């Protein structure tokens, strides 16, 4: 089963992502700040990290850089999931090592499509 770490300090976003992904047989972990995200990434080694830029302690850009600099964690996929939607924001996210960039508000269908693109054969719909 694919494991996804959601890093966001907005409970509504975390809940939306959790509901969207758990319905598709994806295990979801959560972190509300950068330090917790780094700890959980090291402990659980998720396949994918959905990472907000604006976190209360360490910025999402710094978390992304640290994950990509760690040889044991560098292969995990990272999607910046953030309201920062300017061209410069996107460039900074990708320069920090993010594999993709998804702006808020986002469509759950677009999120699933992006997860499937980055993690092929991950999404499996539960029977009705």
Language model regions located:
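The feature encodes the CheY-like receiver
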Residues: 14, 56, 74, 86, ...
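Charged docking surfaces used in two-component/phosphorelay signaling
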Residues: 15-23
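Short hydrophobic/Thr-rich beta-strand motif most characteristic of the beta2 strand and flanking loop
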Residues: 25-32, 40
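Active-site beta3 strand of CheY-like receiver
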Residues: 44-50, 55
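C-terminal output helix
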Residues: 106-116
């Amino acid at each position: 089963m694919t494991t996804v770490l959601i890093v966001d300090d907005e409970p509504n976003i975390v809940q939306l992502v959790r509901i969207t992904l758990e319905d598709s047989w994806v295990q979801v972990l959560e972190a509300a700040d950068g330090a917790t995200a780094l700890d959980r990434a090291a402990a659980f080694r998720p396949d994918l990290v959905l990472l907000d830029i604006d976190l209360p302690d360490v910025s999402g850009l710094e978390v992304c850089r640290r994950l990509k600099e760690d040889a044991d964690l560098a292969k995990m996929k990272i999607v910046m999931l953030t309201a920062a939607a300017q061209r410069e924001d996107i460039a900074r996210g990708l320069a920090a090592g993010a594999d993709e960039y998804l702006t808020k508000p986002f469509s759950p269908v677009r999120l699933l499509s992006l997860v499937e693109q980055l993690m092929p054969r991950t999404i499996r719909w539960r029977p009705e």
